[in-house]
Amino acid sequence: AIENLQKTNPKYKQDCYVLVDMGGASSEFIFCTKEGIFAKSFEIGIVKAKDKYKSIENLLKCKDEVLVPIQKFIEENQKQGRKAKFLVANSGTPTMVCAFKMGLKQYDSKKVFGETLHRVDFRDELERFLALSYKERENLVGVFRADVVPFGIVLFLLFMEILDFQECLILDEGVREGAAILGILDKQI
């Protein structure tokens, strides 16, 4: 997906970018360069943040606990010359925030693919989401996600902050898609 975007948009024709894949129990930070992929998993995800910190306020009070290990990984990569030029987000929270912003009644991965979100978009959509009644939240994202969505949005904002990016590129392709593509490419070589 990135290779195709690099062909059509010079903004993404860079030697290094970082992909953040935020899950329920962990989040992966992946520095992608021409020399290879440098990744690390951190034991903080959306559900884990909700279970551990119980409130957004507590998560924000304890943000250093979350961010210091990530900051060390970022600094290690920068010392090795891996300074990301743009941020890619492919997990459920950023794609969902993009769909909210676009006013999609039904999620469509093709519509969010390649869109750009700014920090202010995450803040605005968090505010809009929190203004809904709990029942409206459940109707929008489902019973099992209604209470974790705010944690996901705040956590991703913290990740953007520590990475020092104001915007991120939204892609809706994950590990399975990447593995499938690599498998196809390996067979073609």
Residue ranges and their predicted role:
Residues I2-C16, F31-I189:
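Helical "lid/coupling" subdomains associated with nucleotide-phosphate turnover
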